[in-house]
Amino acid sequence: MNILVNFADEKYKQVRSINSWTGIHVAGMDLVKEYTPEDIDSSFKNDNVNIFKYKRGCGLWLWKPYFINKVINENKDGDYIFYCDSGGFFIRNPKALYEYLTDEQPLFVCDIPLLESCFTKPECFKIMGCDTDNIK
C-alpha cells in the first residue's frame, strides 16, 4: 500500500486539499492520512506542553515525527509511507524512488539546495558552538 501523510491547521486546509488530490490522482497513492492539530493525543500534548505552546509550526513541528511514527505503527512492513508538506503537490508518480529503498536502507530523504543558515537563527549556531562558515 502507498500511503500519503500530511498535516494542516485551518490556515493550510485548502492548500492541503491540492496535496491530497495530487497524491491520489498524480502520485498514485492508495490512501491519504490527513491530520490536524486536533488529532494529536492529549497526553502527548500535555507531555510536551512547553513545545506546543509555540504557534510557529503548530508547536515547532513536533507533530511531524508524531504522525509519521503513528502511521508507521499502524501499517505493516512493505507499505510505502510518503510524507509531504501540505503546501507541496505532486507533478509525477514517485514510485521510481522506491527502487532506492531496501531492508537495510528503508528511508529516502530529499534535501533542498539551501544552506542551514537559511533556516536557523545565528544565535542558535552560537549556542551550539557551530558558528563557523563550514557548518552554516
Predicted regions and their residues:
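Glycosyltransferase catalytic domains, chiefly GT-A lineage
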Residues: 1-136
